[in-house]
Curated annotation (Swiss-Prot):
Protein name in the entry: Unknown protein from spot 984 of 2D-PAGE of etiolated coleoptile
Additional remarks: On the 2D-gel the determined pI of this unknown protein is: 6.2, its MW is: 27.7 kDa.
Organism listed in the record: Zea mays (Maize)
């Protein structure tokens, strides 16, 4: 879901 993709995106953004 969208929520799952959002979390993954945030993880990459943190890097």
């Amino acid at each position: 879901x969208l929520e799952g993709a959002f979390v993954l995106n945030q993880s990459q953004d943190a890097e």
